[in-house]
C-alpha cells in the first residue's frame, strides 16, 4: 500500500502519458538525444559518476558503445514505466536491475538520485506539460527499489 500512496494510479497514468510523448516511434533520434542530455546533466552535477561509464566509452559520445548504452538506459526506463501497473512483473524486474547494479563497483544511491534529478531537469525542456511531482513520486519509488542495497 505504501507504494500506491507514493506513486498513485493518477501519477502512473500521467507518467505513461508523459513518456508516450517522449517515446513515440517517430522520435527515435530524439530518444537518444534526451537520454544523452540526461547523462550530460548527471555528469555536470555529479562529475565523479562519469568514471562509472568508461566501459561504454563515455569520452567518445558518438561511439556505438556509448549510444548503445543510452538506448539500453532509455529502453530500461521505458520497460519500467510500462510495467507500473503490473506489480509482480515490475518487482521482479526491479530486483533484476538491483542485482545488476550492485555488481558494478562505484554505483551508489546518490548517483541514482542524481539521474532522477537529471531526468526531472531535462524532461521539462522537451515536454510542455511535464508533471514533475508525478514523475518524482514514481521515479523515486522505482529507484528506491533498484538502489536499496547500494552504498
Curated annotation (Swiss-Prot):
Q: Where in the cell is it found?
A: Secreted
Which segment of the chain is annotated as a signal peptide? none
The organism's place on the tree of life at top rank: Eukaryota
Major location category of this protein: secreted
**Keyword entries, A-Z:** Disulfide bond, Heme, Iron, Metal-binding, Oxygen transport, Secreted, Transport
Output the Gene Ontology cellular-component terms. Answer: extracellular region; hemoglobin complex
- Does the keyword section mention Metal-binding? yes
Q: Where does heme b bind?
A: 101
The similarity annotation says:
Belongs to the globin family.
Which protein are we looking at?
Extracellular globin-4
Give the species this sequence originates from.
Lumbricus terrestris
Amino acid at each position: 500500500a505504501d507504494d500506491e500512496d507514493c506513486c498513485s494510479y493518477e501519477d502512473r497514468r500521467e507518467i505513461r502519458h508523459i513518456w508516450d510523448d517522449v517515446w513515440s516511434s517517430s522520435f527515435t533520434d530524439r530518444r537518444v538525444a534526451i537520454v544523452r542530455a540526461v547523462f550530460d546533466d548527471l555528469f555536470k552535477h555529479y562529475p565523479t559518476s562519469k568514471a562509472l561509464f568508461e566501459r561504454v566509452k563515455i569520452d567518445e559520445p558518438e561511439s556505438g558503445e556509448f549510444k548503445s548504452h543510452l538506448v539500453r538506459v532509455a529502453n530500461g526506463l521505458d520497460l519500467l514505466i510500462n510495467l507500473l501497473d503490473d506489480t509482480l512483473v515490475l518487482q521482479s524486474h526491479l530486483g533484476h536491475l538491483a542485482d545488476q547494479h550492485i555488481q558494478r563497483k562505484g554505483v551508489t544511491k546518490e548517483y541514482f538520485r542524481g539521474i532522477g534529478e537529471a531526468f526531472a531537469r531535462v524532461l521539462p525542456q522537451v515536454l510542455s506539460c511535464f508533471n514533475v511531482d508525478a514523475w518524482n513520486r514514481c521515479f523515486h519509488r522505482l529507484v528506491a527499489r533498484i538502489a536499496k542495497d547500494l552504498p
